[in-house]
Design a protein with these regions (language model features):
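Active-site-adjacent structural elements that line small-molecule/cofactor binding pockets in enzymes
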Residues: 1-192
Length: 192
């Protein structure tokens, strides 16, 4: 059995000393993987219910800074040797798939093939509204993004023609070190 650790990279827990200690301790304890959390923005006084808490609110301070999910993992790649490094989860419909493909491939390269791309569709409607992305399209955008990412990783130049994203003759560099970089999908709901 393998164990992964979802750690809170928010506020003071996202600072270098804490990240380094957490990464090294997890690796020494035999933990197989660590994952970061993320939100691009958390609108103040949001009304959406957090589906994983009895209170309907995210744990912790709503105003605590939540850093980019990939950059702390790149830092951990430099201070660890074997632990796998994953986003858990990156809210995929809030990003262009070419950018995500490049971030994950770069992390995989920097870590020597230890990256995991964990993605989700998102639950915080107000976050989507703040980013001007239709909340109702999040599942379809996620599915299409995963196909686009795999396409970008798989060939020298990629063409992708989807409903939301079009990519023409776009080489992606670097390619992932892993032959098939894992994509974990975290989602819940009627359409998922």
């Amino acid at each position: 059995m393998k164990f992964g650790l979802m750690f809170v990279n928010v506020g003071p827990f996202g600072l270098p000393d804490h990240l380094e200690n957490l990464g090294r301790c997890a690796e020494e304890a035999g933990i197989e993987s660590v994952f970061t959390v993320e939100h691009v923005v958390v609108p103040k006084d949001y009304k959406s219910e957090y589906p994983y808490s009895p209170t309907g609110k995210m744990p912790g301070d709503e105003l605590a800074p939540i850093p980019d999910p990939v950059l702390p993992l790149a830092f951990l790649a430099a201070v660890t040797q074997k632990i796998r490094l994953g986003t858990g989860v990156m809210i995929l419909p809030q990003r262009h798939p070419a950018y995500v493909a490049k971030q994950a491939a770069t992390l995989d390269s920097l870590s020597g093939g230890r990256a995991i791309l964990g993605v989700g569709i998102g639950w915080l409607k107000e976050e989507f509204e703040a980013l001007e992305i239709p909340f109702s399209e999040r599942a379809a955008r996620t599915e299409e993004s995963v196909r686009a990412i795999r396409s970008l990783w798989g060939s020298e130049t990629s063409r992708f023609d989807g409903k939301f994203y079009q990519i023409s003759d776009a080489p992606l560099c670097p390619k992932p070190v892993q032959e098939r970089l894992p994509i974990f999908i975290g989602a819940a709901g009627e359409k998922v």
